[in-house]
């Protein structure tokens, strides 16, 4: 994923671990792996689901909950994304990075 992001954003983009805040619900702590994505003055938290089976309404609800607790913009990091899932996420304005080389981070302009 990082090599693709470097092609899109340039060599200054980095990905590193991110620690949850104490008030993060356990269902988010147990269900996702967080990473901090940084590019120049911009940063966001990527939430990657730990399981391979997920439902878009659940992801959207949990991303919104985590966004309320986090001081940074948040996006989903997904392994596989079908065309239908991608279209649904774009229509609902859900930020994401897909390992299949697709990126939608509207808060970065």
Residue positions per predicted region:
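DNA-contacting interfaces and partner/effector-binding or oligomerization modules
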Residues: 1-94
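Charged, structured surface patches that assemble and position nucleic-acid processing machinery
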Residues: 93-105
């Amino acid at each position: 994923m990082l090599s693709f992001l470097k092609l899109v954003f340039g060599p200054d983009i980095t990905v590193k671990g991110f620690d949850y805040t104490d008030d993060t619900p356990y269902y988010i702590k147990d269900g996702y792996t967080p990473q901090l994505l940084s590019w120049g003055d911009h940063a966001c938290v990527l939430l990657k689901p730990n399981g391979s089976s997920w439902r878009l309404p659940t992801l959207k609800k949990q991303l919104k909950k985590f966004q309320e607790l986090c001081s940074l913009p948040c996006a989903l990091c997904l392994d596989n994304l079908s065309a239908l899932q991608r279209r649904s996420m774009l229509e609902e304005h859900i930020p994401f990075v897909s390992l299949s080389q697709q990126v939608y981070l509207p808060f970065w302009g």
